[in-house]
């Protein structure tokens, strides 16, 4: 799903953040927001990419995969939130980033879950901890 990239483009542009670091800071919040809408995809990611081998419900396995990705980011010195990235967008800046992201596409975005303005704001806010 290219949506995390689109969200990062607006954040990176506003705060002059490199794309990779910005993606790492946004991806966990995006993933936790959309995983239930494409649960089989996140279970495959957890098992096949992150090597999650424990048992549990599909939801538990998906979340373990997301957590494993965050652990990987940290292991290579990458941030997994805006705080770790060293930025603290205001509510007005978050609203502006979401509005610009939606305007650039003209409609709801994403394949894991179609995200509207409120969804984008929620993801940015979740990353801003």
Spans of model-derived segments:
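Active-site segments that bind and position negatively charged phosphate/pyrophosphate groups
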Residues: 1-68
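C-terminal charged capping/lid subdomain of soluble metabolic enzymes
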Residues: 42, 49-129
């Amino acid at each position: 799903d290219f949506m995390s990239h689109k969200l990062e483009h607006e954040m990176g542009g506003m705060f002059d953040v490199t794309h990779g670091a910005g993606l790492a800071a946004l991806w966990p919040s995006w993933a936790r927001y959309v995983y239930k809408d494409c649960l089989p995809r996140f279970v495959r990611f957890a098992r096949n990419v992150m090597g999650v081998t424990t048992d549990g419900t599909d939801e538990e396995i998906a979340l373990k995969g997301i957590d494993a990705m965050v652990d990987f980011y940290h292991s290579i010195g990458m941030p997994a939130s805006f705080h770790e990235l060293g930025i603290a967008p205001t509510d007005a800046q978050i609203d502006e980033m979401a509005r610009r992201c939606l305007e650039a596409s003209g409609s709801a975005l994403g394949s894991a879950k179609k995200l509207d303005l409120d969804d984008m704001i929620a993801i940015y806010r979740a990353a801003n901890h």
